Design a protein with these regions (language model features):
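Beta1/beta-strand and adjacent pyrophosphate-binding region of the FAD-binding site
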Residues: 1-11
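Membrane-embedded transmembrane-helix bundle of lipid-linked glycan/lipid transferases
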Residues: 6-8, 22, 170
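Cofactor-binding loop segments of dinucleotide-utilizing enzymes, especially the Rossmann-like FAD-
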Residues: 10, 33, 427
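N-terminal Rossmann-fold NAD(P) dinucleotide-binding loop
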Residues: 14
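Conserved N-terminal/central alpha/beta ligand/cofactor-binding core
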Residues: 20, 26-27, 32-114, 118-134, ...
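Flavin (FAD/FMN)-binding glycine-rich loop and adjacent Rossmann-like elements that form
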Residues: 40, 133-139, 148-172, 176-461
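SH3/SH3-like beta-barrel fold
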Residues: 143-145
Length: 461
């Protein structure tokens, strides 16, 4: 089998890339480890999408997605103009529909098990194997797939039982795994590993969250209570949208604001219902077509040291700790929040919400100076004004730095510096730690995937 484009990871950026490449006529294969698409939006319950610049580019996928969701009641536009409020369950259905409409082939429960590479030779340098300009650059020739749910990693067993095990040729391979698993498999360079070696005390990760949903909430009563308690409309807002109550509120343990919810959380801590760590970050949003539910962007999981999202031992402990925290929060909320008297936990995310993990070293390393200066590029894939948003495990150390001007990201920050036809999209792009803190949001990941698809569609054979 031959494809123009194979995308590993049917998440935020991967779905955008697949949909647009399919619409542009590229033969596209999208492979996904789960049994549904959406990545962090569905498996980690990351909803809503944050608002970004109205001047953003490569927004066809975002607009089509939200329009399709709205048709089945799975999307609303919030009062601030943010169209990115969505229902994560209906998103799964909508993404299936969109991939079919774009003629994208999708394989669930699948992974890439083998990658065949060769030295890169174009028409001008076929006889120049020893040329300094190309001697370190390679080319992805073909890949082999296998079932992601295999629990015994034995090639002999796989070859007998798995019909997926055949080589697939592709012009381009795109890593949309979030953790740059394809780059890792190919032993590519990573900025986070380089930075760690240079500055041992430097933060290279951010705390993770385990999101959850509570249902059975009287949203009208909660809305009345929270808007009377908190008059800061930069923190707490509530509106009737399409006949339903929609709202958002927040609290952190930082002292940068006179948080209205601080006395409430303090009382919960004093009663022993929650710990101080449980209260370090709290944020809630309503969900379209889930009229008695709230999505929680918490608990934020902190520890004495940075935890690498790739560390299975540490993240396993973190998941169990997080679920215990969710249980404590639910008891606290039922006692102290009006409208929560009969509320219950209805969903806990299948995966941790990861803000940053592996970051590739690409053709161009995008820096915080590029972002702050609004540096222009020949091949931008997005335009944003979202702030540099870096969460800390320490009190009063998180930053939310708004930018005075818009910034853009070049396609070259998505391209491998080692392989001619290998790209990464999503949170694992080639950007330094601070810049990545602004680029990781859903709309920007959509634009990365779409921008790359359009760029590749314009390239020759």
């Amino acid at each position: 089998m031959k494809y123009d484009l194979v995308i590993a990871g049917g998440g935020t950026a991967g779905c955008a890339c697949a949909y647009i490449s399919g619409k542009l006529g590229l033969k596209t294969l999208l492979i996904e480890k789960n049994s549904f698409l959406g990545g962090t939006m569905t498996s980690a319950l990351v909803t809503p999408a944050m608002k970004t610049s109205e001047n953003n580019i490569n927004t066809d996928f975002f607009n089509d997605l939200m329009n399709n969701l709205h048709e089945i009641g799975g999307q609303i536009t919030y009062a601030d103009g943010n169209k990115g409020w969505f229902n994560p369950e209906l998103l799964k259905i909508t993404l299936d529909k969109m991939m079919i409409s774009a003629n994208v082939e999708v394989l669930f429960n699948t992974k890439i098990s083998e990658i065949i590479t060769e030295p890169y030779l174009n028409k001008e340098n076929k006889n120049a194997l020893n040329s300094n300009s190309i001697q370190n650059e390679k080319y992805i020739k073909k890949i082999k797939l296998s079932n992601y749910n295999d629990t015994i990693c034995d090639d002999n067993i796989n070859h007998k039982q798995n019909k997926l095990l055949e080589y697939i040729e592709t012009r381009y391979l795109v890593d949309g795994t979030g953790n740059a698993k394809i780059f890792e498999k190919l032993n590519c360079e990573f900025l986070n590993k380089i930075e760690k070696e240079k500055i041992s005390e430097k933060n290279i990760f951010q705390p993770m969250n385990l999101r959850f949903i509570m249902s059975g909430i009287n949203l009208k009563e909660f809305s009345k209570w929270i808007t009377e308690l908190d008059k800061d409309r930069n923190v707490t807002t509530s509106y009737i949208i399409e006949g339903q109550t929609h709202l958002s509120t927040a609290y952190t343990w930082d002292n940068n604001k006179d948080w209205a919810l601080r006395p409430v959380f303090k009382a919960g801590i004093e009663e022993g219902l929650i710990t101080e760590e449980d209260s370090n970050y709290f944020q809630v949003f309503t969900i379209p077509q889930m009229h008695s539910s709230l999505a929680f962007n918490c608990p934020r999981l902190i520890s004495d040291t940075d935890i690498n999202p790739e560390d299975t031992i540490q993240t396993s402990k973190l998941l169990m700790s997080a679920r215990a925290s969710i249980q404590r929060l639910s008891v606290f909320l039922r006692k102290f929040f009006k409208g929560f008297e009969h509320a219950y936990i209805s969903s806990i995310a299948n995966e941790l919400g990861i803000r940053v993990s592996n970051r590739i070293k690409g053709k161009y390393v995008y820096t915080i100076d590029d972002l702050k200066s609004g540096k222009k590029f020949k091949n931008p894939c997005l335009v944003s004004n979202y702030p540099v948003d870096i969460h800390s495990k320490e009190k009063n150390k998180s930053t939310l730095e708004h930018q005075m001007q818009e910034y853009s990201l070049p396609i070259e920050s998505l391209q491998s510096c080692n392989y001619k036809n290998l790209f990464a999209i999503g949170r694992c792009i080639s950007a330094d730690f601070e810049a990545q803190g602004a680029l990781r949001i859903i709309p920007s990941c959509f634009s990365m995937g779409e921008g790359l698809a359009k760029y590749l569609a314009q390239q020759g054979d």
